[in-house]
A protein has these predicted regions:
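Extended active-site neighborhood of metal-dependent phosphoesterases/phosphodiesterases
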Residues: 74, 79-182, 188, 256, ...
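Active-site glycine-centered loops adjacent to acidic/histidine catalytic or metal-binding residues
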Residues: 13, 66-67, 99-100, 202, ...
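Active-site-proximal beta-strand elements of phosphoester/diester hydrolases
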Residues: 5-19, 157-168, 198-200, 261-266, ...
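N-terminal active-site segment of His-dependent metallophosphoesterases
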Residues: 1-74
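His/acidic metal-ligating clusters that form di-metal
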Residues: 56-61, 159-161, 170-261, 322, ...
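Beta-strand-turn-beta hairpins that frame and shape the catalytic cleft
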Residues: 1-9, 20, 147-162, 192, ...
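Acidic/histidine-rich helix-loop elements
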Residues: 12-45, 110-116, 169-175, 211-216, ...
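Non-catalytic terminal accessory segments
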Residues: 1-3, 299-521
């Protein structure tokens, strides 16, 4: 039976924060000043996004995939529910998932009064279903009550699987085995009835970059490597996610040959404040996604900037402060690192190693790095004269913007790209000379070039606007072909031959140091 194309609007991670819980004073500043989230103005950002969505006539379906509130504050829930009701009154159909930021196990969270943190009521997990049942569960054709997951018939031939992953009963996010059996039964029923499945959950199943997979592994969906293959083999080919605050689209293919696209949308409350629109058209085997940024006027002072410039300034300021702290104050760095999904204990563990490098980093320029990589890049000083004085810290900020914003700031032809890859090739050559495989250390990539290069350039699916082919589904017992990987653009940077000389010089320096110690001590 022919299916009419279905269009949906997607936002996530609104982190709504009630002003009643405090937006000024030393306690608030200490807790939130170094965050990428613009909590103080989360209401203004959400209202601007919803005004824009109300005026968008492409669809009446709006999906929110979790972390609706900042930390589960009862006041925040009450206020955001009224804003969601107002969106429904405009004629929109609104479907909401809650997630880990929407409740506290003890029913308490922090508010800020002057210099003090004061405990206030927060929602407990068991309260959330009734609080949000008018945004999805009330019209569900199936509900898994314990996980608060539900299935809705969005239109003829289309079902939404809203899969709550806030716990898997094994100490992680994700789905319990019992919940997954329910998902499996619902997927089988959908396929039997010729229903196209659109799924949404909160935590990502595919990391937006190798670096994120290493430092933010605990922020991925629990058992993601297994679950993403299982979901693909259930016929769930498209899943909408959030949590990372990174705008990204990625894809995996299961061993059986089935496909899963993870379409991640960045947070409304941080850079770049996107609204994603997706059109599903099974009859032509195509899904298209486009991204709009919040452009409605917001009710706070942007200090002469556009909204995106203001949010970018917030993000970059946080990164610069982190790099400064890395060279001077490891406890402060540990406190700040949680805003980027980096665990405090990891910072304390490697802080001694980070500190001396961070001190040098704060004074380093691209020109100085370029001199080290001339043999690899073939660049002459006049080739990079326009960027020679650019701070490496500013360049790192560009990479963070690249990651969170889903942008593609550098191509393989840009000198910043060549210089960075040249440096990474030198590092790889040192490890090769030492016969050490980088994967043993970094776990998620075979080389340091493969580990860091995706921060420079996205050679995969565009994060903002993309056409995604709907691929065939293979039942159990069938075997599909894995699609050919797209070739990466040719890069002119040569592999480095400096590894052996660097290792030899290092060994000689160590021998000389030991001899001096023996002679004088």
């Amino acid at each position: 039976m022919a299916k009419t194309p279905l269009t949906v609007t997607v936002i996530t991670d609104t982190h709504y924060y009630s002003k009643k819980t405090g937006t000024k004073g030393k306690a608030y500043d200490a807790a939130n000043a170094k965050s990428q989230k613009l909590l103080k103005y989360s209401e203004e950002l959400l209202r601007a996004a919803f005004k824009q969505i109300k005026e968008d006539k492409r669809t009446d379906i709006v999906l929110l995939s979790g972390d609706t509130t900042n930390n589960g504050e009862i006041e925040a829930h009450a206020e955001v529910i009224e804003i969601l009701r107002d969106l429904k009154k405009s004629g929109k159909r609104v479907y909401v998932l809650t997630a880990t930021h929407d409740y506290q196990d003890d029913g308490l969270t922090d508010s800020f009064v002057g210099n003090e943190k004061v405990k206030i009521p927060a929602a407990k997990r068991e309260q959330l279903y009734d609080m949000y049942k008018e945004f999805g569960p009330d019209e569900a054709i199936a509900v898994h009550r314990d996980s608060m997951s539900y299935v809705v018939q969005l239109a003829d031939g289309y079902r939404l699987f809203a899969l709550n992953d806030d716990r898997n009963l094994s100490g992680k996010s994700g789905f319990s085995d019992e919940c997954f059996e329910w998902i499996k039964a619902q997927a089988e029923d959908a396929r039997k009835n010729d229903q196209f499945i659109l799924a949404m959950t909160h935590h990502p199943l595919i990391a937006p970059s190798p670096i994120y997979e290493l430092i933010g592994k605990n922020d991925m969906l629990g058992d993601y490597e297994t679950r993403r293959n299982e979901l693909a083999d259930l016929g769930i080919q498209f899943i909408l996610t959030g949590h990372t605050h990174v705008h990204d689209i990625d894809v995996i293919t299961s061993d059986r040959g089935n496909t899963l696209y993870d379409i991640a949308t960045a947070a409304t409350v941080g850079y770049p404040a996107p609204i994603r629109t997706i059109v599903f058209d099974p009859d032509v085997k195509m899904v298209s996604t486009t991204t709009d940024l919040i452009t409605e006027t917001v009710d706070f002072d942007l200090e002469g900037k556009t909204l995106q410039e203001y949010l970018k300034y917030q993000l970059i300021g946080m990164v610069k402060d982190m790099i400064k702290a890395a060279g001077t104050d490891i406890p402060t760095l540990a406190d700040m690192a949680t805003a980027m999904s980096i665990k405090k204990k990891l910072i304390y563990k490697i802080g001694w190693l980070i500190k001396p490098f961070a001190k040098k980093l704060n004074a380093l320029t691209i020109g100085k790095v370029a001199k080290l990589t001339r043999a690899e890049t073939g660049l002459k000083p006049e080739d990079y004269a326009d960027i020679a004085d650019k701070s490496v810290v500013d360049f790192i900020c560009d990479l963070v913007v690249n990651l969170y914003g889903g942008e593609d700031l550098y191509s393989v032809d840009d000198n910043e790209y060549k210089i960075t890859v040249g440096l990474l090739h030198i590092v790889d050559s040192v490890f090769a000379a030492l016969h050490i495989k980088p994967r043993k250390l970094i776990k998620v990539a075979d080389s340091f070039t493969d580990f860091a290069e995706p921060l420079l350039h996205n050679s995969g699916i565009p994060s903002y606007d993309a056409i995604l082919p709907i691929r065939p589904f293979y039942k159990e017992g069938e075997q599909g072909k894995k699609p050919q990987e797209e070739k990466k653009p040719e890069c002119s940077v040569k592999k480095s031959k400096k590894g052996v000389p660097i290792v030899v010089c290092g060994i000689l320096a160590l021998i000389i140091l030991l001899l001096l110690l023996l002679l004088f001590f």
